[in-house]
């Protein structure tokens, strides 16, 4: 049976069994146009607090690598590719962790676009892990 885990439970689970934690989302911003892909980066005000201080650079490096993979696939990137938001996931994660926004309700959700998103994320993961 499927079980819904909250953000803290998902983060704790990933900290213990995963090499990284990537949460995929389509932004619920209500816009009538596709604003593109981006990752949620750690706000400056949290970067000196533990455990964030020991891991935020890994989170941002993973996010930047994923965005670059998506850019390579020709996907739209929102502004500079990141947005600072305080998230439980990155605040308590001890492994590279990122929330990826892959567009919004107005984005193209065709099989072709979903395949391009998947290919871009794989490119970014391979680059991050040096494969």
Label each PLM-derived region with a short phrase:
Residues 1-131:
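Active-site-proximal helix/loop segments of hydrolytic enzymes
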């Amino acid at each position: 049976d499927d079980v819904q885990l909250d953000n803290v439970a998902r983060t704790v689970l990933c900290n213990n069994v995963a090499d990284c934690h990537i949460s995929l989302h389509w932004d619920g911003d209500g816009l009538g146009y596709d604003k593109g892909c981006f990752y949620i980066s750690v706000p400056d005000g949290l970067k000196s607090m533990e455990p964030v201080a020991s891991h935020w650079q890994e989170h941002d490096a993973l996010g930047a690598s994923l965005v670059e993979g998506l850019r390579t696939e020709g996907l739209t990137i929102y502004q500079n590719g990141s947005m600072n938001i305080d998230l439980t996931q990155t605040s308590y994660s001890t492994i590279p962790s990122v929330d990826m926004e892959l567009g919004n309700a107005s984005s193209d959700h065709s099989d072709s676009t979903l395949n391009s998103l998947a290919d871009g994320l794989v490119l970014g993961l391979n680059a991050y892990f040096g494969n």
